[in-house]
């Protein structure tokens, strides 16, 4: 799949008592968009048992502690504070940590190993020049038949935007160049414009982000902060 997360998907995840309990309601993610993304990811993974799961750029993960303990969980992150992230790991018992980035081809990450990999709000921070290695490494670590789930922050306005269309094309087609395929048809309607069925960040959430990243104030003032969700298979 490749689409913008919809309100109905978010609400479905909130209505799932197991998901809501695992993420302790609204406690784990105070920000609106992160809350949407966490719940979408957790709704995909809540039934997972006995799987090898790697969070990419997990930092001090909100998802890994909420997963079934019968899974083998890994957290891949440099912990160098990139994107206002942490510089030290609050280590979780029985979770394996690899202090690297996807795209480094870290020897600690075995080939053809993971049933599931996922990232939350990571891909939009990666320079385009590094994306090829990101997808190549993501494909390397996955088992055949494994799934890669990624949620990506993006700003969408009322009118078509050529630069946005190019960025979306890169997100759609680059993984295919490295051996991935989509688990179902791409649903996103093009050109991409904001519609009221999309789950979106609150104005308060974007105001908070303005204090952290003021370079994007103009974009936030005229666009909605939403999330792409994609599911790839090897």
Provide a role label for each language-model segment:
Residues 105-117:
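A short acidic, Gly/Pro-enriched loop at the edge of an enzyme's catalytic core
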Residues 159-191:
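Conserved Class I S-adenosyl-L-methionine
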Residues 132-144:
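A short glycine-rich, Lys/Arg-flanked "PGG" loop and its adjoining helix->strand segment in the class I
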Residues 1-48:
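Class I SAM-dependent methyltransferase Rossmann-like catalytic core
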Residues 145-153:
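Conserved beta-strand signature within the Rossmann-like core of class I S-adenosyl-L-methionine
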Residues 93, 97, 189-234:
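A C-terminal cap/extension of S-adenosyl-L-methionine-dependent methyltransferases
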Residues 115-129:
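A short SAM/SAH-binding and catalytic strip from SAM-dependent methyltransferases
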Residues 54-106:
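Class I SAM-dependent methyltransferase SAM/SAH-binding core
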């Amino acid at each position: 799949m490749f689409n913008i997360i919809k309100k109905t998907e978010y609400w479905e995840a909130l209505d799932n008592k197991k998901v809501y309990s695992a993420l302790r309601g609204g406690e784990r993610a105070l920000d609106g968009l992160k809350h949407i993304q966490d719940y979408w990811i957790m709704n995909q993974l809540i039934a997972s048992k006995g799987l090898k799961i790697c969070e990419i750029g997990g930092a001090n993960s909100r998802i890994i502690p909420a997963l079934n303990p019968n899974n083998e969980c890994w957290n891949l992150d440099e912990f160098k504070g990139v994107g206002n992230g942490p510089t030290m790991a609050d280590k979780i018992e029985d979770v394996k940590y690899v202090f690297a980035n996807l795209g480094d081809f870290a020897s600690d990450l075995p080939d053809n190993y993971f049933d599931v990999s996922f990232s939350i709000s990571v891909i939009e921070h990666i320079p385009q020049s590094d994306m090829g290695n990101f997808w190549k490494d993501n494909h390397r670590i996955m088992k055949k038949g494994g799934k890669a789930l990624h949620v990506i922050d993006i700003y969408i306005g009322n009118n078509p935007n050529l630069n946005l269309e190019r960025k979306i094309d890169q997100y759609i087609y680059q993984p295919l160049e490295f051996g991935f395929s989509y688990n179902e048809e791409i649903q996103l309607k093009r050109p991409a414009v904001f519609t009221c069925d999309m789950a979106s960040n609150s104005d308060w959430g974007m105001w908070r982000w303005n204090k952290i990243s003021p370079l994007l104030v103009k974009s936030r003032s005229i666009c909605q902060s939403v999330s792409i969700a994609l599911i790839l298979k090897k």
